[in-house]
A protein has these predicted regions:
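N-terminal secretory signal peptides that target proteins for export/translocation
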Residues: 1-26
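Flexible, membrane-associating and regulatory peripheral segments of lipid-active enzymes
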Residues: 2, 44-140, 150, 383-385
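Bacterial N-terminal signal peptides
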Residues: 31-42
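Active-site catalytic motif of lipid deacylating hydrolases and related acyltransferases
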Residues: 117-191
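Structural recognition of the beta-strand scaffold that forms the well-ordered cores
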Residues: 126-128, 159-162, 193-194, 222-223, ...
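Solvent-exposed loop/turn segments at secondary-structure junctions
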Residues: 132-135, 164-167, 198-202, 226-230, ...
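Serine-dependent carboxylesterase/thioesterase catalytic core
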Residues: 174-274
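C-terminal catalytic-base region of ester-bond hydrolases, centering on the histidine
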Residues: 279-385
Length: 385
C-alpha cells in the first residue's frame, strides 16, 4: 500500500464514523418524535390521574372469579410452555416459560391433558386490531411478518385490520365491521379470532356490539393488553398531543375524527361497558400484561411511575385489572411491558432498542401460537362446559 493511500485511511474512517453518527442521530430523532407525540404516556402534571367525579356508573373492585371471570391460567400455561419448549431457542426473543409469564396470586393447576402441537384442525385466523397511533408509525417500524410466517407453519393464519390511528373507538368499529364483511364468508364454523391490542380492544368490542352482522363470522374475541377499562393516563392527555404522531417520519395517518384519547379515558370506557353488555354466543378471552418492574423499558419508566400513583401493577400504560373483558376467560398474566407484547421496536431498530426500548424482547410468535391453540381447544368444548 502506498504512503498516500495510508494517509487517506484516517479520513475515510472519520467519514464512516460521521455517517454512523448521522444515521444514529436520525434514528434518535425518530424515536424522540414518536415519544414526544405520545406524551399521554407520561405527562408531567401533578393533578390526580383519576379526578373527582360523580359521572360514573356504580363500580366495584372484586376478585375475578366473583365477577364472572373464568380463570384458565393453569391450562394456558401448559400450552404456552409446551409451545416454547417445542419451538425452542430458535424462536426470536426466546424466553423460558417461567420468565415469560407472571404468577399472580394462586394460579390454578394445569390439567395434565395432552397438548396438540401439530396442524390446526380449525385453521383459525387471528385478525388483529392495533392500538392508538399504529397507522402513524407502522411505516417507520416496518415490522417483520415473523408471527404470520410462524403461524402458517401450523395451519393457522393472521391478518392486520387497518383502523384509523387517531380516531374514536366508535369510528374504528365501523372499519372493523367493513373489514370483516369483506372477508370470505365461512362455509363452516367461523375461523376469525379477533385480537384487540391496547385501544384496539375497545374498538373491537364496539364493533361486536354495534354490528351484529359480523358475529356469525367470529369464532372468538381476545383482549391482548386491551384498554377495556381505559387508562388513567388518558385523563391527563389531550387529543392534539396524540395528533403529533402524524409527524413521525414516513407517517401517512390523519387525525381522523380526533376521538382516540377520549375513547381511552376511564370514564368513557366504563360508562360504555355499563350501557353495552357484550353479545352472547361468543367466547371472550383476556391476556393481561403484568410485568415485573425490571421488565419495563427505560423509555416507559416515567409513565410506569406516573401510573403507579394509582397502582404500581401496571404495564406503563394500563393497570392490570383494566385489561380484563367482562365475562371473559383469563388466560395469562404476561411478563412484558405494554410495547413488548406487540410492538417489536428493538427488532427493526436495534440502536433505539438498546438505548430506549430496553425491555422490548418477547417471544410473540410463541405467544400467538399458544393463544390460538388454547382457543381452538376451548371452542371444541360445548358452551358452558
Amino acid at each position: 500500500m502506498r504512503a498516500s493511500e495510508l494517509k487517506r485511511i484516517p479520513s475515510l474512517v472519520a467519514s464512516k464514523r460521521r455517517v454512523v453518527v448521522i444515521d444514529a442521530w436520525h434514528g434518535l430523532r425518530v424515536a424522540l418524535a414518536t415519544l414526544s407525540a405520545c406524551v399521554l404516556l407520561g405527562a408531567c402534571a401533578t393533578k390526580p390521574l383519576v379526578p373527582y367525579s360523580t359521572d360514573t356508573p356504580p363500580m366495584i373492585l372484586a376478585p375475578a372469579t366473583q365477577a364472572g371471570i373464568a380463570d384458565e391460567r393453569g391450562r394456558f400455561r401448559e400450552i404456552y410452555c409446551a409451545v416454547l419448549a417445542a419451538r425452542g431457542p430458535g424462536l426470536p426473543d426466546y424466553r423460558p416459560c417461567e420468565d415469560a409469564l407472571t404468577r399472580v396470586g394462586t394460579e390454578p393447576a394445569g390439567t395434565g391433558k395432552p397438548i396438540a402441537l401439530g396442524q390446526s384442525r380449525r385453521h383459525l385466523v387471528a385478525a388483529v386490531v392495533p392500538g392508538i397511533g399504529y397507522d402513524c408509525f407502522k411505516p417507520w417500524l416496518n415490522p417483520p411478518d415473523t408471527v404470520v410466517t410462524h403461524l402458517r407453519q401450523f395451519g393457522f393464519d393472521a391478518t392486520l385490520i387497518d383502523v384509523d390511528a387517531l380516531s374514536s373507538s366508535a369510528h374504528n368499529a365501523r372499519q372493523i365491521r367493513d373489514a370483516i364483511m369483506a372477508m370470505p364468508e365461512p362455509d363452516g364454523a367461523p375461523r376469525i379470532v379477533l385480537i384487540g391490542y391496547s385501544k384496539g380492544a375497545p374498538d373491537m368490542l364496539e364493533a361486536l356490539v354495534a354490528y351484529p352482522e359480523i358475529r356469525s363470522r367470529i369464532a372468538a374475541a381476545v383482549s391482548a393488553a386491551g384498554a377495556i377499562g381505559g387508562s388513567p393516563l388518558a385523563n391527563d392527555a389531550e387529543q392534539y398531543q396524540a395528533d403529533l404522531l402524524q409527524y413521525v417520519p414516513e407517517a401517512t395517518c390523519t387525525s381522523g375524527d380526533d376521538g382516540a384519547v377520549q375513547s381511552l379515558r376511564p370514564a368513557t370506557r366504563k360508562m360504555w361497558l355499563a350501557q353495552h353488555p357484550l353479545p352472547g354466543g361468543l367466547r371472550y378471552y383476556s391476556i393481561v400484561t403484568f410485568p415485573q418492574p425490571e421488565r419495563i423499558s427505560s423509555i416507559l419508566k416515567s409513565s410506569y411511575d406516573k401510573l403507579s400513583r394509582v397502582d404500581s401493577r401496571n404495564d406503563s400504560q394500563l393497570i392490570f385489572y383494566d385489561e380484563v373483558m367482562p365475562g371473559s376467560t383469563l388466560l395469562a398474566y404476561v411478563n412484558a411491558d405494554h410495547w413488548a407484547l406487540a410492538v417489536p421496536v428493538a427488532r427493526t431498530h436495534p440502536t433505539i432498542g438498546a438505548l430506549f426500548v430496553t425491555q422490548n424482547a418477547y417471544p410473540r410468535e410463541a405467544l400467538a401460537e399458544a393463544i390460538l391453540r388454547f382457543v381452538e381447544e376451548d371452542l371444541a368444548k360445548p358452551p358452558g362446559r
